[in-house]
């Protein structure tokens, strides 16, 4: 069963529909994040979906939240032993009509003030970073060593932020100096240091499992009482990261990936990048789903059972 859009009939107020997530308000301090099976590429949502993708994103995010729990606070509400998320929601949402839309793809989260940056960390040069480097020798305005090849590892992971665009708009790559202007120098520095630390820990873990995390996008909030930075949204999923096959990794070319790159390549080859109303052929749906599942199983060590 594929869920492309949740309909809760006003039981909880809908706060927003993002590219993938439907967000509902549970109470003044709590939100319900529901990961649908929608998939977007080049800032456009495809007409059809990837079955169970939202469940996979949710389970993988939960895995990484736990993995990083000693390194950073996250926005998850603790679910008491023996309870489920439905014990914290209006009873009506346990009815089959609603439960089937929410089960295994929902996170109950604390509300936090969002830091208005897409916090991207790059360990390897690829994508828009590679294109910029070829033209100017820089990445997000930062001078890079000469002679880097496509897909090569940077000497150190780098913080390359972008703006958080409204849906339908494009995120814009900015320099760390511009990020400091947006959110303040101290907060920008703290976010950059934390993001690089989290990425590095996860990159090392994934490498042992045979997956290279080339880059990823974090989002952070701030606890306005304690000034602590909080890890929010999704974490290190195939939607927010580039995952490469470590066994076939080769510097100087594009890589075999477990993420949306496969879909992006198909769109580009068919001159459909950025075009609205695109329906993916079944084989692209199936192969994208298979790549997401392989990434999940490899990283978590758990068999996909849906």
UniProtKB/Swiss-Prot annotation:
Keywords: Acetylation, ATP-binding, Ligase, Nucleotide-binding, Purine biosynthesis. The keyword RNA-binding does not apply. Pathway: Purine metabolism; IMP biosynthesis via de novo pathway; 5-amino-1-(5-phospho-D-ribosyl)imidazole-4-carboxamide from 5-amino-1-(5-phospho-D-ribosyl)imidazole-4-carboxylate: step 1/2. It comes from the Eukaryota. GO terms for cellular component: cytoplasm; nucleus. One of its GO terms (molecular function) is ATP binding. Its EC number is 6.3.2.6. The keyword Flavoprotein does not apply. Disulfide bonds: none annotated. It is an enzyme of class 6 (ligase). Present with 4280 molecules/cell in log phase SD medium. Belongs to the SAICAR synthetase family. HAMAP family: SAICAR_synth. Catalyzes the reaction of 4-carboxy-5-aminoimidazole ribotide (CAIR) and aspartic acid with the formation of N-succinyl-5-amino-imidazole-4-carboxamide ribotide (SAICAR) in the purine biosynthesis pathway. This is Phosphoribosylaminoimidazole-succinocarboxamide synthase. The gene is ADE1.
